[in-house]
Amino acid sequence: MRSHYCGGINESHIDQEVTLCGWVHRRRDHGGVIFLDLRDRDGMSQVVVDPDTPESFALAEKVRSEFVIKVTGRVRRRPAGTENNNMPTGQVELLGKELVILNAAATPPFPLDEHVDVGEDVRLRYRFVDLRRPEMINRLRFRSRVTSYIRNFLDSRGFMDVETPILTRATPEGARDYLVPSRTHEGSFFALPQSPQLFKQLLMVSGVDRYYQIAKCFRDEDLRADRQPEFTQVDIEASFIDEETLMGLNEEMIRSLFKDVLDVELPEFPRMPYSEAMQRYGSDKPDLRIPLELQDVGDLVESVDFKVFAGPAKDPKGRVAALRVPKGAELTRKQIDDYTRFVGIYGAKGLAYIKVNELTKGAEGLQSPIVKFLGDDVALAIMERVGAEDGDIVFFGADKATVVNEALGALRIKVGHDLNMLTCEWAPMWVVDFPMFEELPDGNLTAIHHPFTAPSCSPEDLAADPANALSRAYDMVLNGTELGGGSIRIHDEKMQEAVFRILGIGEEEARAKFGFLLDALKFGCPPHGGLAFGLDRLVMLMTGSSSIRDVIAFPKTQSATCLMTQAPGEVDEKQLKELHIRLRRSAKAVEGNKAENKE
């Protein structure tokens, strides 16, 4: 039907006859000559239709934005002075001699110009129109290129692309499962996989040795800018391998991907223990582009009369930390109030601060309502510890360590961006030596990653002191975003049972939920490990998009709905009956029916 894409004609095609197909991006009538900007996924070409071809000219008068047309004509150089150097095709135009309207179009719900700001709800409602925009189609093309590169890289390293089931059973992996009722097994449900975790481990038991999959995963959780109920991950697993080899392989893949696709030379990835990341940055995924760090000052304030600081300083689970912001004394009262409200989102009860006006004057050179409560000596000791200089501001967090880390860690990121403090464009890293477990509010332990992560100690040492055990887990972080996480897995049945016991999973429950895994561990399971990347998140970062919704063809909203298809939707009574399901109506629906009956 066509000989070339719209973005593919140039000066080498002058005097050639070509056929283009696409959407009319813009129509202009200039004194009896009609200009059409014709667009497809590869770009745009200018088509000229003049009265010398009366039939085509009559059709050109009828076309409007987003009409689908086919044009055959001769490529010619644009007249001097009318070239468009901003377009790859801007030196030439197509003199149309035969035009066919393939389909008319209703008026689009929004203009398709890149600079037009359109509400996301409208874009998602008409996603099939939104995806025609060059920036959107370019993101999909970019994603395809990234996926293709990853496949080729892993293929070349001996990995096999193996598909794992979508209909499986519910397993505790940290989020709620999406459940699928079984028609043939009354009262039973499949679950959509949160990850292929157990299946890829079983593939290692099966001798596959090196596996990968571009896998769809599903998690019924509250959504954020970088979360979707269904998402895509690059899933990797290998046998007879240690964490050093796995991290090296995946680092090589990401660095070579950035070089090939973006022509960016990423530096080698530094490694940082989890405890150090939390201590210095308040986060297990620190953004190393921002040169701000948290510093402990609890030992300096535990004896002061200021209970706001002294209380957390004496609490074994508390923390008092300072965040020095160079030149931050210029912040206005309103800005500080805004930051105070911001840290409140993370549970902080306030945001104490000290402005450093002139250190040579001692405590008199410090500006803050808390200096008098700390005492001059303590205030100056804090300034010395954090390396404060004239013109700085020092923020403080004093609370449970978890609250201080979250609040000051988030403030560090916000201030760094607000004050344009980023020192580089890309800052990758590995976070290693994660704890095996974390304590829940009720005092029980839960796995930080998942219960199949291998500890770095023996089963006996693990049982003796599980709260302080470290795991053989590792996370890849880029610009403060977790790109992927992985670990060496448990390949010994006794170790797996020991972990289950610590998590409060008894023998009967373990057998009911993971019997197939425990059986597999008895039949010669090799040492193995792996890692999974969030493909959506990776493409979001590489394209500079603000949300993964911008790099997914048909995403869900933050309330987990599809505005285009109106999913999720109700199903009819017949389908429910076949699935042996009866819906319990909400109180709101019952009240509505009562009101209708009264009428």
UniProtKB/Swiss-Prot annotation:
Molecular function via GO: aspartate-tRNA ligase activity; aspartate-tRNA(Asn) ligase activity; ATP binding; nucleic acid binding
Gene Ontology annotations of biological process type: aspartyl-tRNA aminoacylation
Residue ranges the record marks as coiled coil: none
Annotated region described as Aspartate, given as residue ranges: 197-200
An annotated GO cellular component: cytoplasm
Record CDD domains: AspRS_core, EcAspRS_like_N
Gene3D superfamilies with a match to the protein in the record: Bira Bifunctional Protein, Domain 2, GAD-like domain, Nucleic acid-binding proteins
Chief place of localization: cytoplasm
Record EC number: 6.1.1.23
Record's catalysed reaction(s): tRNA(Asx) + L-aspartate + ATP = L-aspartyl-tRNA(Asx) + AMP + diphosphate
Site (Important for tRNA non-discrimination): H30, G81
Residue numbers binding L-aspartate: E173, R219, H449, R489
Keyword terms of this UniProt record: Aminoacyl-tRNA synthetase, ATP-binding, Cytoplasm, Ligase, Nucleotide-binding, Protein biosynthesis
Top-tier EC class: ligase
PANTHER family: ASPARTATE--TRNA LIGASE, MITOCHONDRIAL, ASPARTYL/LYSYL-TRNA SYNTHETASE
NCBIfam families in alphabetical order: aspS_bact (TIGR00459), PRK00476.1 (NF001750)
Free-text function comment from the UniProt entry: Aspartyl-tRNA synthetase with relaxed tRNA specificity since it is able to aspartylate not only its cognate tRNA(Asp) but also tRNA(Asn). Reaction proceeds in two steps: L-aspartate is first activated by ATP to form Asp-AMP and then transferred to the acceptor end of tRNA(Asp/Asn).
Oligomer and partners: Homodimer.
Similarity annotation: Belongs to the class-II aminoacyl-tRNA synthetase family. Type 1 subfamily.
HAMAP family, per database record: Asp_tRNA_synth_type1
Protein name: Aspartate--tRNA(Asp/Asn) ligase
Organism: Marinobacter nauticus (strain ATCC 700491 / DSM 11845 / VT8)
Gene: aspS
